[in-house]
Amino acid sequence: MTAILERRESESLWGRFCNWITSTENRLYIGWFGVLMIPTLLTATSVFIIAFIAAPPVDIDGIREPVSGSLLYGNNIISGAIIPTSAAIGLHFYPIWEAASVDEWLYNGGPYELIVLHFLLGVACYMGREWELSFRLGMRPWIAVAYSAPVAAATAVFLIYPIGQGSFSDGMPLGISGTFNFMIVFQAEHNILMHPFHMLGVAGVFGGSLFSAMHGSLVTSSLIRETTENESANEGYRFGQEEETYNIVAAHGYFGRLIFQYASFNNSRSLHFFLTAWPVVGIWFTALGISTMAFNLNGFNFNQSVVDSQGRVINTWADIINRANLGMEVMHERNAHNFPLDLAAVEAPSTNG
């Protein structure tokens, strides 16, 4: 008997690298999207931490009145933020090498653009990596589709809104009080609370929280009893056991009697699709609403008050909202302009002399 030994050619370094990147045996899957995700998110995180601690004040309104946002310049965790790039920069791409010096780059809020653009690229790649790992494992792609909702929301406030408004200075600041300031100004300028897409987002988030709590508590309560009536049902289970502990028939029966029969799912896949779709679709709509309001297609307005036969205004809640919006609008960027756009649009009276 003759044995023929064939010498295998050793795999190239590039081939081994490709196999390692796409291997599902790694403790953490990297993937081709991960090759871009890792450096972009590390960059965004590193610059965020450094800037939050030590960045000098930024001339956000482009009027030579810098606003402090970092901890070393007098802020705390609540008031601190990465201040958006200056209105003097607008939508220009503003990397470090475009500035005359690092001091100028910091003064004009360069870190904000750097963080936001790297962050958006990173989370988009994270979404792609979710799809990629699902594909390698033969799974369906809906995990990445669900994650597209927060990605769309982040893209709306950090990129689409500044594009629509003409400047990165209108983007959401990266901090707690900065986020609230963004929300208040957004309401003042766009009446977002009266936009149907925002209403759908509120229903999606609050409804999703309710359904998640209902589902979790129902599953936790619907135990397959392994014990007698004289001892606790909890005694029949070990934490993390492999055996099934949840009886969907019992859960369906309970919930069907608590509300009514057809309010309860008897199919696990239908139930979990609903739990996924409700908040995801709601947040999609909110992101779409932000993206349309970016171009000043705003929420409903009731600028024409209700009047009686004598022409006197009959105050409604709409008038209260209008007055609140005007109050918020005159208070923001108060040194950049003297009047909000609503008031400044009125033709000035002529004067004699």
From Swiss-Prot:
Post-translational changes noted in the entry: Tyr-161 forms a radical intermediate that is referred to as redox-active TyrZ, YZ or Y-Z.
Record: residues binding Fe cation: H215, H272
Gene for this chain: psbA
Subcellular location: Plastid, Chloroplast thylakoid membrane
Residues that, per the record, bind pheophytin a: Y126
Species this chain originates from: Barbarea verna (Land cress)
Residue span(s) of the pro-peptide: 345-353
Positions bearing the site annotation: Tyrosine radical intermediate: Y161
GO MF terms, alphabetically ordered: chlorophyll binding; electron transporter, transferring electrons within the cyclic electron transport pathway of photosynthesis activity; iron ion binding; oxidoreductase activity, acting on diphenols and related substances as donors, oxygen as acceptor; oxygen evolving activity
SUPFAM superfamilies for this protein: Bacterial photosystem II reaction centre, L and M subunits
Spans through the membrane: 29-46, 118-133, 142-156, 197-218, 274-288
Keywords in alphabetical order: Acetylation, Calcium, Chlorophyll, Chloroplast, Chromophore, Electron transport, Herbicide resistance, Iron, Magnesium, Manganese, Membrane, Metal-binding, Oxidoreductase, Phosphoprotein, Photosynthesis, Photosystem II, Plastid, Thylakoid, Transmembrane, Transmembrane helix, Transport
Cysteine-cysteine disulfides: none
Catalytic activity: 2 a plastoquinone + 4 hnu + 2 H2O = 2 a plastoquinol + O2
High-level lineage: Eukaryota, Viridiplantae, Streptophyta, Embryophyta, Tracheophyta
Site positions per UniProt: Stabilizes free radical intermediate: H190
More about this protein: 2 of the reaction center chlorophylls (ChlD1 and ChlD2) are entirely coordinated by water. Herbicides such as atrazine, BNT, diuron or ioxynil bind in the Q(B) binding site and block subsequent electron transfer.
Domain of life where this protein originates: Eukaryota
Binding-site residues for chlorophyll a ChlzD1, renumbered to this chain: H118
Record protein name field: Photosystem II protein D1
EC number assigned by the record: 1.10.3.9
Enzyme class at the top of the EC tree: oxidoreductase
Record-linked InterPro entries: D1/D2 (IPR055266), Photo_II_D1/D2_sf (IPR036854), Photo_RC_L/M (IPR000484), Photo_RC_L/M_CS (IPR055265), PSII_D1 (IPR005867)
Residues bound to chlorophyll a PD1: H198
Amino-acid positions noted as binding [CaMn4O5] cluster in the UniProt annotation, renumbered to this chain: D170, E189, H332, E333, D342, A344
Binding annotation for a quinone: H215, S264, F265
PROSITE patterns, sorted: REACTION_CENTER
